[in-house]
């Protein structure tokens, strides 16, 4: 997966709490098991006025021209609640998002995001609201998320600190998913296997 060190990008917001995985990627789009092609269905029921997805909802933030190309999403508490579908971070990443900022995340969604190279950043309610206010007030507002420094810099230059488990930070900084992490120990694994009796190999 793509490493995440420091990213500056256009920010978009969804000013709602408890955004669940069925809203992120509705169940009718889960037939694929590969990670690509889900971005077009992201927030389908909010982005489109029709079931076919031919009529964009002009009121939904992700459809507004000022947010085109956004790569950082800001939302409210308990983002990613609901079912454990891994398609949710797949859809967010396929849409072009690199980081999600919220006061809290559902635990399974949080882990799935890290495992798929999408950085979930927890900030306080007050800090999240400040980011939303600044983004709303300034078209083209960009936010910087620095995983090395564990900071988020707002459009006005305010700096907020965040925490993440050391193992998760290491994996994201080095672009290591579960397979990549295993392959990092390829020499040790091969050495161990070479010492196994033939009947165990």
From Swiss-Prot:
A molecular function (GO) term: 3-isopropylmalate dehydratase activity
Pfam families attached to this UniProt entry: Aconitase_C
Keyword check for Lyase: yes
InterPro entries membership: 3-IsopropMal_deHydase_ssu, Aconitase/3IPM_dehydase_swvl, AconitaseA/IPMdHydase_ssu_swvl, IPMI_Swivel, LeuD
One GO-annotated biological process of the protein: L-leucine biosynthetic process
N-terminal signal peptide: none
Listed GO CC annotations: 3-isopropylmalate dehydratase complex
Entries under SUPFAM superfamilies matching the protein: LeuD/IlvD-like
Catalytic activity annotation: (2R,3S)-3-isopropylmalate = (2S)-2-isopropylmalate
EC numbers on record: 4.2.1.33
Enzyme class: lyase
UniProtKB keywords: Amino-acid biosynthesis, Branched-chain amino acid biosynthesis, Leucine biosynthesis, Lyase
Regions that span the bilayer: none
Gene3D superfamilies: Aconitase, domain 4
Pathway: Amino-acid biosynthesis; L-leucine biosynthesis; L-leucine from 3-methyl-2-oxobutanoate: step 2/4
Highest taxon in the source lineage: Bacteria
Quaternary data: Heterodimer of LeuC and LeuD.
PANTHER family per the UniProt record, alphabetical: 3-ISOPROPYLMALATE DEHYDRATASE SMALL SUBUNIT, 3-ISOPROPYLMALATE DEHYDRATASE SMALL SUBUNIT 2-RELATED-RELATED
Family of the protein in this entry: Belongs to the LeuD family. LeuD type 1 subfamily.
Cited function: Catalyzes the isomerization between 2-isopropylmalate and 3-isopropylmalate, via the formation of 2-isopropylmaleate.
Protein's UniProt name: 3-isopropylmalate dehydratase small subunit
Gene that encodes the chain: leuD
């Amino acid at each position: 997966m793509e490493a995440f060190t420091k990213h500056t990008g256009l920010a978009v917001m969804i000013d709602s709490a408890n955004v669940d995985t069925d809203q992120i990627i509705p169940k009718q789009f889960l037939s694929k098991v590969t990670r690509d092609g889900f971005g077009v269905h992201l927030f389908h029921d909010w982005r489109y006025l029709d079931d076919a997805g031919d009529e964009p909802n002009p009121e939904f933030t992700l459809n507004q021209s000022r947010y085109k190309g956004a790569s950082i999403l800001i939302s409210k508490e308990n983002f990613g609640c609901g079912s454990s579908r891994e398609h949710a971070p797949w859809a967010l990443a396929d849409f072009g998002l690199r980081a999600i900022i919220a006061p809290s995340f559902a635990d399974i969604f949080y882990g799935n995001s890290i495992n798929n190279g999408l950085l979930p950043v927890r900030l306080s309610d007050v800090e999240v609201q400040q980011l939303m206010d600044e983004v709303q007030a300034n078209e083209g507002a960009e936010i910087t998320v620095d995983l090395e420094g564990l900071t988020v810099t707002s459009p006005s230059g305010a700096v907020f600190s965040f925490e993440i488990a050391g193992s998760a930070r290491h994996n994201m900084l080095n672009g290591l998913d579960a397979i990549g992490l295993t392959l990092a120990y390829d020499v040790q694994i091969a050495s161990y296997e070479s010492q196994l009796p033939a009947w165990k190999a």
